[in-house]
């Protein structure tokens, strides 16, 4: 039987992971909007274009790293979650798969 502290820790981890996924998706959307705005720059010179592309590339790389970190954290704790918790009829594996699917759909857009 799990102690209340263990249950609280597991729930806290799940909420943190879901918050991190939402944060990552939000930042990916910001990058997408930023790309659309950058295309509308009027009469840009080569230096401006290179600077903006560099900024976008750096932001995109940071978001990819954040996504990979999230996947590692979730997979590292998969056994703990699978053994101890089910949320609204969904297993931990199903919750993680749903989160990965959302991120993949965001990448495709």
Curated annotation (Swiss-Prot):
Q: Where are the transmembrane segments?
A: 5-27
- Coiled coil ranges (UniProt) are 58-83
Any idea where this protein resides? Virion membrane; Host cell membrane
The membrane topology of this protein is: Single-pass type III membrane protein
Q: Which GO terms describe its biological process?
A: proton transmembrane transport
Q: Which residues lie on this side of the membrane: Virion surface?
A: 1-4
- Provide Intravirion-side residue ranges: 28-109
Q: Name one GO cellular component term.
A: membrane
**Which key words tag this protein in UniProt?**
Coiled coil, Host cell membrane, Host membrane, Hydrogen ion transport, Ion channel, Ion transport, Membrane, Phosphoprotein, Signal-anchor, Transmembrane, Transmembrane helix, Transport, Viral ion channel, Virion
Q: Which domain of life is it from?
A: Viruses
Q: How is it modified after translation?
A: Phosphorylated by host.
| Site (described: Seems to be involved in pH gating) | 23
Presence of the UniProt keyword Calcium in the record: no
What residues does the record give for site: Essential for channel activity, possibly by being protonated during channel activation, and by forming the channel gate and the selective filter? 19
Q: In the record, what terms sit under GO molecular function?
A: channel activity
An additional note in the Swiss-Prot or TrEMBL entry is: Influenza B virus genome RNA segment 7 encodes the M1 (AC P13879) and BM2 proteins. Normal translation produces the M1 protein. The M1 termination codon overlaps the BM2 initiation codon in an overlapping stop-start pentanucleotide 5'-UAAUG-3'. Termination of M1 translation triggers reinitiation on the BM2 AUG in the +2 open reading frame.
Q: Subunit details for this protein?
A: Homotetramer.
What is the role of the protein in this entry? Forms presumably a highly low-pH gated proton-selective channel. Trp-23 may function as a minimalistic gate that opens and closes the pore. When the environmental pH is lower than a threshold, the BM2 channel would be activated and selectively transport protons across the membrane from the extracellular side to the cytoplasmic side. Crucial for the uncoating process.
Identification of the protein by name: Matrix protein 2
What organism does the record attribute this protein to?
Influenza B virus (strain B/Ann Arbor/1/1966 [cold-adapted])
Native organism taxonomy: Viruses, Riboviria, Orthornavirae, Negarnaviricota, Polyploviricotina
């Amino acid at each position: 039987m799990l102690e209340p502290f263990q249950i609280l820790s597991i729930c806290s981890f799940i909420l943190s992971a879901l918050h991190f996924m939402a944060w990552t998706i939000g930042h990916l959307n910001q990058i997408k909007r930023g790309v659309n705005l950058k295309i509308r720059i009027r009469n840009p010179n080569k230096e401006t274009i290179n600077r903006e592309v560099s900024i976008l590339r750096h932001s995109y790389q940071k978001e990819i790293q954040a996504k990979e970190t999230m996947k590692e954290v979730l997979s590292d704790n998969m056994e703990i979650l699978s053994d101890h918790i089910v949320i609204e009829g969904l297993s931990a594996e199903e919750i993680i798969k749903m989160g990965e699917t959302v991120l993949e759909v965001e990448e495709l857009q």
